[in-house]
């Protein structure tokens, strides 16, 4: 379960990081 949540947090973190570079 924690690995699943970790993967989601990791993907969300990458998405936010990439999204912040757009602007």
From Swiss-Prot:
Sequence intervals crossing the membrane: none
Organism whose genome encodes this protein: Styela clava
Compartments, record wording: Secreted
UniProt keyword list: Amidation, Antibiotic, Antimicrobial, Secreted
Protein name according to UniProt: Clavanin-B
Keyword Glycosyltransferase among record annotations: no
Gene Ontology annotations for the cellular component aspect, listed alphabetically: extracellular region
Gene Ontology biological-process annotations: defense response to bacterium
Annotated function: Has antimicrobial activity.
Highest taxon of the lineage: Eukaryota
Residues recorded with modification Phenylalanine amide: 23
């Amino acid at each position: 379960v924690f690995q699943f949540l970790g993967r989601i947090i990791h993907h969300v973190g990458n998405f936010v990081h990439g999204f912040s570079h757009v602007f």
